[in-house]
């Protein structure tokens, strides 16, 4: 009885929209004002200590195992958005974050993390990425742009900002499936070099280089970017620093500087948050982006200045 009382207290203040909750004993309670927009059914009680310390992981796994059922139009999106808006929601409290900065992120860890995410097969990513196989934020210049066009827009936007001149050298850190490399070499006249820890991405890029007959214009390496030598006129890194880990951010920006020629130019594109640990979530770390960390703007700017 005490367990359910605690559940009721937590859930009654978890969302800012009306929600109907059916508990494991079959009883239903409505929380919030108005007709429930979402119906939640909890088929069994979850350990309270785990629920309150890592709620997204516990509830995410429960949903996967069908111990938690959610009904309603765009129900999951509504619940997540509502929880983030709700002041004091237990779903935003996560003791997991306190331990995150202490997690190991060596070169071996980085390789394992990247391969666990990207080496599940190019066929899988090809099912839902656009034809360029670009796996980062797109730039929709016009409402009717396709995803493919928006990804191409993004690459041109990056390369134009670098004010590239013919004959220069460009390094793309975390080159993925090679889109930046191909466009830079074919349309901007540079010698492009890419580096990735993903065997699948490396194989795909090598194949594309051969098919496009760009062997004399593009190099790609399967290694840690920190092991690279030499210097380049331009350095790009798109959607990469989210993978390096909090404790390696300083080294990341220092490495970018080391690899850049004097008076060279770099463009770093990534996702940032407004506060420490933004975007770090135990469910995402376990199932989607192991080792991932979303830095805030202050962190990034400080590391750039220190480099």
Residues of each region from the PLM?
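Class I SAM-dependent methyltransferase SAM/SAH-binding core
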Residues: 186-226
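Conserved SAM-binding loop of SAM-dependent methyltransferases across substrates and taxa
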Residues: 177-188
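Conserved beta-strand signature within the Rossmann-like core of class I S-adenosyl-L-methionine
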Residues: 263-271
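A short acidic, Gly/Pro-enriched loop at the edge of an enzyme's catalytic core
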Residues: 226-235
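Conserved class I S-adenosyl-L-methionine
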Residues: 166-174
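Substrate-binding/catalytic lobe of Class I Rossmann-like enzymes that use SAM or dcSAM, i.e.
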Residues: 271-307
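A short glycine-rich, Lys/Arg-flanked "PGG" loop and its adjoining helix->strand segment in the class I
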Residues: 250-262
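Feature captures hydrophobic
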Residues: 1-151, 157, 161, 186
């Amino acid at each position: 009885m005490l367990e359910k009382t605690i559940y009721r207290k937590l859930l009654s203040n978890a969302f800012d929209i009306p929600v109907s909750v059916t508990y494991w004993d079959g009883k239903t309670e409505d929380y919030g004002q108005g007709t429930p927009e979402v119906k939640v059914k909890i088929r069994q009680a979850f350990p309270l200590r785990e629920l309150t310390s890592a709620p997204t992981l516990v509830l995410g796994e429960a949903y996967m195992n069908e111990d938690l059922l959610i009904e309603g139009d765009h129900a999951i999106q509504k619940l997540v958005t509502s929880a983030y808006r709700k002041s004091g929601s237990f779903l935003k409290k996560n003791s997991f974050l306190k331990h995150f900065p202490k997690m190991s992120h060596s070169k071996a860890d980085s390789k394992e993390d990247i391969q666990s995410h990207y080496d599940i097969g190019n066929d899988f990513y090809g099912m839902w990425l656009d034809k360029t196989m670009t796996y980062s934020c797109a730039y929709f210049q016009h409402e009717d742009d396709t995803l493919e066009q928006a990804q191409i827009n993004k690459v041109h936007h990056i390369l134009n900002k670098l004010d590239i001149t013919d004959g220069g050298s460009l390094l793309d850190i975390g080159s993925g499936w090679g889109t930046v490399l191909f466009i830079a070499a074919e349309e901007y006249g540079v010698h492009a070099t890419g580096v990735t820890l993903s065997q699948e991405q490396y194989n795909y890029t090598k194949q594309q280089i051969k098919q496009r007959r760009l062997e004399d214009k593009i190099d790609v390496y399967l290694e840690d970017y920190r092991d690279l030598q030499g210097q380049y006129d331009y350095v790009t890194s798109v959607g990469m620093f989210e993978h390096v880990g909090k404790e390696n951010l300083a080294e990341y920006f220092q490495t970018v500087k080391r690899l850049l020629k004097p008076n060279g130019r770099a463009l770093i594109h990534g996702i940032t948050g407004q506060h420490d640990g933004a975007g770090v979530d135990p469910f995402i770390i376990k199932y989607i982006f192991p080792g991932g960390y979303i830095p805030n703007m202050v962190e990034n700017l400080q590391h750039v200045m220190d480099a």
